[in-house]
Every structure is written in structure tokens, then in C-alpha cells.
């Protein structure tokens, strides 16, 4: 029981950071922030972040519209203003990104505005010849809600600098604002490419067993995530989806994606083309390594993406305790030394999947490094901006063995 307590406390403690991230190394040392590529309407310290959530809507004590940890049977799509640095101007923010003064003000979010409220699922249905079909009276408004969502995303893509969508799926013990502010940091670090959308599942349960409640809520959310991704991939203007998932969010993401990939292949379609999947980033994945081998690797999950990037830290204390609790090696803690010869052969065959060991991160930052570490933020930015693979001139990571790489503290400045 003591191990359970420590696990939950540490995992929770690593999730509550809502500050402007330290400037990525690439902008401080290798060149200025790419302002010229940022559309005029996005040159602000208070951009809008889009969201899709199946949390229950609430009004906070301060009168703010937000979403709780409770589950909702209906998805909501909307927007929320995120002030990355209250009191700063756009010029102040740019100077900070290039000067590395390490000032990290608290991020402030506004009211969450719902633009499309979806019908609750499952939709009412009837059986005909043994086949369940939604009632037309229920299906018609649901389809119109999807079209309204698609129209808004289409409009955003038409004025963006790229026809890409960057999705973030948070982990355990994250409130709605936690996911929103994390995506705002990552998206800003990339040079604000494409359209940012946070998928916020009903995590952030309190109490000793909140971790387990959140795990179940992740299972609850998988159908809604699939519906969101199906609707999104059908937007004509969309060219590429980049999906970033963290910790327990990697289970929610890969479970939904796995089912979508299976369905697309069964229908005779190439999921990479039909779902427009480009980059999948799994940061500190809280996944059982054995389950990954049998459900993802054995089912050829990888070819559905342009590339898959797994950020790992063998000293990730939160995943270490989760590993003790769940009695299975966590995917976010593996290293090349953990693998037997047969496993090395398997990973070498997976050409578009790369495992990146993040150097010199411990303690609280040992689990949240993907959103706090300037070197990791630099690599995410380079991967999404260029599509380059590790070891290329654009992403000069240090090879450890096969498709295992090391990301040094000063990356991408000095490579040995």
C-alpha cells in the first residue's frame, strides 16, 4: 500500500505545471524564433487553443466556464484563450525565446467557449436483420454536429501557415487547463505550425485511488477519441495529423488509434492515407512493454504513421513506481540494455519507430521533461517542422544502437 501511495503522489506531483516553458535550445543558440512563418493573427501572447473533450462542463467558483474531471457522454468542441505571459507583449515573448533568460510566468486561461455540443453517445439505435443502426432522428443531428466541427477546423486550416493539426492528449491527474497550457507551450515552441487541438479526457480524479479512476476514465474516452479523429481526418483541407501523447494519455491514444487502424485495413484502405497520420509522439509512455509488443508491434501498428517517436528516461521515477505497482516494465523506461537479442531484432525491423533516451533529467522533471526540457522541445519542434528522422542533419541525435538514440542536454548544439 505504501508503494501505491508514493506512486500516486509522485505521478500527481509531476503533472501540475502551468508556466511558460523555457525557450527551446534551437532558438536560443541556433537562430531566432521563426516569427516570419507565424501568421499575423497568431502574433499574440494570447492565442486561442481549440479543444475536444468529454469532461462535464462546470462553472468555477470564480465564475469561469471550464470542465471538470467528471465524465460526460457527449463531446464538446470549442476554443479557449491562453495567455502565455500576462503583461508581456508579443515582442517581449520573442525576445524571451531568443535570450534564454529563463523567466517562466504563470499561464492564464480564459473561459472555455463551446462551439459545438455533440449529442450524447451511444446514439439510440434499432436492430434490423441483426444489425444495429442508429435511429435516423438521432443520427441526423449528430452528423450535422460533425459537419459544424469540420467547417470550423476547415476555416482555421485555411488561414494557418500549414494545413496540419497538432493534437495533444494529456496524462493522469491532468485537469482541463493542464492539457490546454501544455499544448500551448509545445505548439508555441514549434513556431505555431498548423492548428492546435487538445483532446481532454476526464482525468484529474482526487483521492488515493485517483490513478485507477483515471485509468478507467481513459477507457471510457476511447470511443469519443475515435469519433474525433474520424471526423477530423475527413476535413478536406487537412493534410497531416501530428499527435503527441503523454504518460497515461499514450494508452488512450494508442488504444483508439489501434482500433482505427484495424478498421481502415479491414475496409481495404491504407490508414496512413485515409486517417492522414503523420507523426505520433509518445512521451514518457505509461504502457506495459509486454502489451506494446503483443498489441502494437505484432499487429504492425507502426506503418500507419509517417514516424513514431518515443521519448524515454530510464530514471523516470514516476514510471518506476508505476512499474512496481503494475508489475510490468513500462515502455517509457526501457533502454537498449533492457532488450534481449530477439527484441533488438524486432525493433531494428521497425524502420519508422525511434526511441530517444533523454539525458540528465531526474526528480520532478524526470516525468514531465517533454514539456519543460529545452532540448526535448527543440527535437519536437524539428520533427514536426521538418519531418526529419533522427541522425539526419536536421535532427543530429547521437545513435546508441539500432533505432535507439540519445538526446543530450545541449542538443542540437554539440554532438559527439
Segments the model singles out, each with a brief description of its role:
Residues 140-153:
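Alpha-helix-centered segments that form part of catalytic cores
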Residues 167-171, 246:
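The conserved beta1-alpha1 loop
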Residues 10-13:
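C-terminal motif of bacterial Sec signal peptides marking the signal peptidase cleavage site
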Residues 19-133, 139, 158-159, 180-184, ...:
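Lipolytic serine-hydrolase domain surface
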Residues 1-2:
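Bacterial N-terminal signal peptides that target proteins for export
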Residues 225, 245, 249, 253:
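Gly/Ala-rich beta-loop-alpha elbow adjacent to hydrolase catalytic centers
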Residues 174-179:
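Short substrate-entry loop that stabilizes the transition state in hydrolases
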Residues 150, 158-164:
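Proline/glycine-enriched tight loop/beta-turn segments at coil->beta junctions
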